[in-house]
UniProtKB/Swiss-Prot annotation:
Name under which the protein is recorded: Protein FAM187B
Superkingdom in the source lineage: Eukaryota
Keywords of the record: Glycoprotein, Membrane, Signal, Transmembrane, Transmembrane helix
Extracellular membrane side: 18-333
Glycosylation sites per record: 45, 68, 130
Disulphide bridges, residue numbers: none
Organism the protein comes from: Macaca fascicularis (Crab-eating macaque)
Length: 369
């Protein structure tokens, strides 16, 4: 993607404040599984707040002040923005007010997006089955599903998705997100992974889900000459929001991609379809929460510009050839109009001369030159 396009996208989201956020009641401790690689806002309503963290993977440590971590930013109102979080940043996040009192505490498991298991319900693809953790005990690994997101289209057939997070449960104990449970333990299992499930949907249009933002048009995207593809990034799109793409007004669906029928584009599962890989020029439109937010127009190639120039030049030459004949026709038409006009003037004057107006006795002379 062109650097300017990335720059515009990076400025768009902070200005509009549309980061996906999670919140926790003041004074409470909340536990949440999320996905790595997807921006998140940890809510803390305390202006001038200080944040402390403790990453639970790796060596044991203690709470440290959150400074100089490149992908984290404390917002003016006190919330913590984490851009492109990594699995290694799984851990504890504490928000303290400027008086030194704890406002809220989060336990966050950033589950590895690169291991995401994707299925489509209408294709008969099945989610992961429950398994036992290979530790010799009876810990159960299972998927805890989030509610279905809104349908990505209304009035027309669309799709919706839901996220499933890896959880581990011991007998008679409350389940925990997998990597918060495992902490420093080095355990490998193909079952320790998050999930994404998609299904078809068809709903009526309402105003409840719309973002109510103006859409933006990006011109002149080009396919990379070496790779022959380019990535398009939908502003405000997120794994946690409904996203939908058009290519020349043709819907791009998860069902087509996961069934192997569509090879001209690729919806990136790790971003929930926010990023689209395209292999041919077209007009691409993206929608977030059923609302158009961006349109991407392809750049015109030099070959196309040259062909258009040649076509315009040929049309101009044809017009010049036809110009003399058209001029003669126009001249003849003008002469005919002048002749008819002269005759009408003479007839009008003659009628006035023959029948003068009542009450007027004057001599009228018709002069014809």
């Amino acid at each position: 993607m062109p650097p300017m396009l990335w720059l515009l996208l990076n400025f768009a989201a902070p200005a509009l404040g549309f980061y996906f956020s999670i919140s926790c009641p003041s004074g409470k401790q909340c536990q949440q599984a999320l996905l790595s690689g997807n921006d998140i806002l940890l809510y803390c309503n305390s202006s001038g707040a200080h944040w402390y963290y403790l990453f639970t993977q790796g060596k044991k440590g203690r709470l440290a002040s959150l400074t100089n971590i490149s992908n984290m930013e404390i917002m003016p109102e006190g919330s913590l923005l984490i851009k492109d979080p990594s699995p290694s940043q799984t851990g504890l996040y504490h928000c303290w007010n400027k008086n030194g009192r704890q406002v809220v505490q989060y336990e966050i498991d950033f589950q590895d997006i690169s291991t995401l298991h994707v299925t489509h319900k209408d294709l008969g693809q099945r989610p992961l089955q429950n398994e036992t953790l290979p530790l010799g005990s009876k810990e159960l690994i299972f998927t805890r599903w989030e509610p279905w997101q809104d349908c990505n289209r209304c009035k027309e057939p669309g799709e919706r998705k839901r996220l499933g997070y890896c959880y581990i449960e011991e007998p008679l104990k409350e389940a925990m997100p997998c990597w918060l449970y495992l902490g420093e333990m080095l355990v490998w299992s193909s079952r320790l992974r998050p999930e994404l499930q998609v299904e078809a949907c068809h709903v009526r249009c309402t105003n409840n889900t719309q973002l109510r933002v103006d859409y933006v048009i990006f011109d002149n995207f080009r396919l990379d000459e070496e790779t022959e593809f380019v990535w398009l990034d939908c502003p405000l799109g997120s794994m946690y929001r409904p996203v939908y793409w058009h290519a020349n007004d043709t819907p791009l669906t998860w069902e087509s991609q996961l069934s192997g029928r569509d090879f001209t584009t690729f919806l990136d599962p790790s971003t929930g379809g926010r990023q689209l890989q395209v292999f041919q020029p077209a007009i691409y439109k993206c929608f977030v929460q059923q609302e158009l937010v961006a349109q991407f127009n392809p750049a015109t190639s030099p070959e196309t510009l040259e062909a258009q120039w040649r076509e315009n030049d040929a049309q101009w030459r044809e017009a010049r050839k036809a110009l003399p004949g058209r001029a003669d026709s126009v001249l003849k038409g003008l002469k005919l109009v002048l002749l008819v006009g002269t005759v009408l003037v003479l007839l009008g004057a003659l009628l006035k001369f023959i029948r003068p107006s009542p009450g007027k006795r004057s001599k009228q002379v018709l002069m014809v030159k």
